[in-house]
Design a protein with these regions (language model features):
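Short amphipathic alpha-helical segments
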Residues: 73-76, 101, 150-153
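Short hydrophobic/charged patches on amphipathic alpha-helices used for structural packing
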Residues: 1, 21, 66-69, 113-114
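Secondary-structure junction motif
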Residues: 11, 39-41, 46-97, 163-166, ...
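A late-sequence structural motif
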Residues: 38, 139-181
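Beta-alpha-beta core module
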Residues: 16-27, 111-159
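Short beta-strand-centered segments that line the small-molecule binding cleft or hinge
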Residues: 1-52, 118-121, 138-141
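Hydrophobic hinge/microswitch elements
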Residues: 1-5, 11, 83-139
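Short hydrophobic segments within beta-strands
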Residues: 32, 78-80, 155
């Protein structure tokens, strides 16, 4: 609003603002669950491993997706704090499933939530981009819901001129992530 930031990233769906937006990439929100949780036995036909996510199996049309979060009604969750886009999405996903989640903890950083799931503290919503190494600490679940896909844009003021370095940055990052748009 005050034009103090040159560029930022944002994933607000259907923004109604006057900012210049360049779509960069999409990520997919998954439910990450510690391997030891019994829900994994119930949903074994939907469970994905870290290797599956690393090889982008979750993006394949034949990859099974949970139709609702209803089976997770008794699973404790680690949620992000209010104000975070993923918090808003998780609230909407729970509401659509008509469940009142068990919130074990709220944290401000997605990476913190991810590591707490690795430690067995609860389930969490994570980005598929976070799964960077093969491990057996958790299972992942693709969610069949429009809110489970986020488009990230580079955002800048439409009132300000884009400098050559800003344009070069946007072009560089756009070409790098183009396959993921």
């Amino acid at each position: 609003r005050e034009n103090k930031i040159d560029l930022t990233f944002n994933c607000i769906p259907n923004p109604k603002d006057n900012f210049r937006r360049t779509p960069i990439f999409k990520d997919n929100v998954l439910v990450a669950v510690p391997t030891s949780y019994p829900i994994n036995n119930t949903l074994k036909n939907y469970a994905l491993t870290a290797r599956d996510i690393m090889f982008r199996r979750n993006l394949m049309p034949d990859c099974p997706a949970i139709p609702s979060l209803a089976p997770f009604a008794d699973v404790p969750f680690i949620l992000l704090t209010k104000g975070n886009n993923l918090y808003s999405r998780s609230v909407a996903l729970f509401e659509d499933a008509k469940i009142d989640p068990i919130v074990r903890l709220q944290v401000s950083q997605l990476v913190t939530a991810y590591h707490l799931v690795c430690s067995g503290l609860g389930a969490a919503f994570i980005s598929d981009w976070m799964v960077l190494y093969d491990h057996d600490d958790m299972r992942y679940y693709k969610i069949a819901h429009p809110l489970a896909v986020r488009q990230f844009d580079v955002v800048s003021s439409s009132r300000n001129y884009l400098s050559k370095p800003q344009k070069a940055f946007i072009e560089s990052i756009s070409s790098y992530y183009h396959p993921y748009l």
